[in-house]
């Protein structure tokens, strides 16, 4: 009997989602002659029983080709709302759509919610990791991360020249509330002088001392500071600055650091803040993200054909392999290892990455 599978994108968007959709539709159609339904706007579309036949109505194999270099997701996505408040509706929708299996492309939050729904409804679920934060456990790589790193590095390349021209300290705030993979990778690749991440606490004195040393010892009158939005102060500094008019929670991590540098230097150091924001989520997917998305999409279809459900496609040791979704959810988010090779490499290059423990 011909299978009917569904596919949805959930959570924040990122480059490479359309590449996954392209791979799933192409492989499912060419190899297995399955029907593929795209479910718009994640669990909202599932609850409302919306579905788009991706191998019909203009989405033939020739028409899918442009998806390879298209950012965002043609299916739309949401990252808000209380999904579990509509459990019964969504459980009924899976049956009403007559799905034999569902492919979910999401981050750790989405995977947790969809895994819970699948467990309650006995769905046949296969997951694909996507996140610019790269914080999904048990996989070395997630769709969207590489492009986001490249986007930040491009911004750092541009900002370095304007910082040098004006002898400024440029603070670049990037995404990463609980994990600093994005800031760490982009900061090292982009030649940052300071990288602040959630996993390693920093002090105002340590930060200011490092910038002063760049000027006094190395005659570097400019500096590039990359800070994750979830970077954490040491406890002593938190207590001292809790009443500050520009605490991180009030005006943003980047602006807070700029104000502290100005205060330490008695306003002798000129600072500027650049919050990259959602530009990190956009753009044409990189070659690596296209390859990752394609292999992940193909592997997800094969897992369905093999009857291997409750699995997420992961990248480990150069191969795409299945790992149990429940293990991924239990071990996520994946944090930066403070003693890992990336942190140690950054420190050996003279980059301030917070205080050593």
Swiss-Prot record:
**An example molecular function term from Gene Ontology annotations:** diphosphate-fructose-6-phosphate 1-phosphotransferase activity
Active site (catalytic residues): 133 (proton acceptor)
Q: What EC number(s) does its UniProt record assign?
A: 2.7.1.11
Q: Which residues bind ATP?
A: 12, 80-81, 107-110
Q: How is its activity regulated?
A: Subject to allosteric activation by ADP and other diphosphonucleosides, and inhibition by phosphoenolpyruvate.
Instruction: Tell me the residue numbers annotated for binding Mg(2+).
Output: 108
Look up the record and report any one GO term of the cellular component aspect.
6-phosphofructokinase complex
**Record Pfam families:** PFK
Keyword list (alphabetical) reads: ATP-binding, Cytoplasm, Glycolysis, Kinase, Magnesium, Metal-binding, Nucleotide-binding, Transferase
Ranges annotated as spanning the membrane: none
Task performed by this protein: Catalyzes the phosphorylation of D-fructose 6-phosphate to fructose 1,6-bisphosphate by ATP, the first committing step of glycolysis.
Q: How does it assemble?
A: Homodimer or homotetramer.
Q: Which family does it belong to?
A: Belongs to the phosphofructokinase type A (PFKA) family. Mixed-substrate PFK group III subfamily.
Q: What is this protein called?
A: ATP-dependent 6-phosphofructokinase 2
Organism name = Nostoc sp. (strain PCC 7120 / SAG 25.82 / UTEX 2576)
């Amino acid at each position: 009997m011909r299978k009917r599978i569904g596919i949805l994108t959930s959570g924040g968007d990122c480059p490479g989602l359309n590449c996954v959709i392209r791979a799933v539709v192409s492989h499912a159609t060419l190899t297995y002659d399955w029907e593929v339904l795209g479910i718009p706007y994640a669990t909202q579309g599932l609850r409302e029983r919306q579905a788009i036949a991706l191998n019909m109505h203009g989405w033939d194999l020739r028409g899918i080709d442009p998806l390879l270099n298209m950012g965002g997701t043609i299916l739309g996505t949401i990252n808000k709302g209380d999904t579990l408040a509509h459990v019964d509706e969504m459980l009924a929708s899976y049956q009403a759509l007559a799905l034999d299996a569902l492919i979910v492309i999401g981050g750790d939050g989405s995977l947790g919610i969809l895994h819970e729904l699948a467990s309650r409804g006995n769905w046949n679920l296969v997951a694909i990791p996507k996140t610019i934060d790269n914080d999904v456990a048990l996989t070395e790589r997630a769709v969207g991360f590489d492009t986001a790193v490249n986007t930040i590095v491009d911004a750092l390349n541009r900002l370095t020249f304007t910082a040098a021209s004006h002898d400024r300290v440029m603070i670049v705030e990037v995404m990463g509330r609980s994990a600093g993979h994005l800031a760490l990778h982009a900061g090292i690749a982009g030649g940052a002088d300071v990288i602040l991440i959630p996993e390693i606490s920093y002090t105002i004195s340590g930060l200011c001392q490092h910038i002063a040393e760049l000027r006094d010892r190395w005659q570097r009158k400019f500096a590039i500071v990359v800070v994750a939005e979830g970077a954490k102060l040491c406890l002593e500094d938190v207590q001292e600055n809790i009443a500050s008019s520009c605490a991180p929670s009030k005006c943003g991590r980047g602006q807070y650091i700029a104000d502290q540098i100005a205060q330490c230097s008695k306003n002798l150091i000129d600072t500027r803040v650049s919050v990259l924001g959602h530009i990190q989520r956009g753009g044409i997917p990189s070659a690596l993200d296209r390859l990752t998305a394609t292999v992940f999409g193909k592997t997800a279809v094969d897992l369905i054909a093999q009857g291997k459900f409750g699995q997420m496609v992961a990248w480990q040791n150069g191969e795409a392999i299945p790992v149990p979704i429940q293990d991924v959810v239990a071990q996520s988010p994946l944090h930066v290892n403070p003693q890992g090779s990336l942190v140690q490499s950054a420190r050996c290059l003279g980059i301030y990455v917070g205080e050593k423990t």
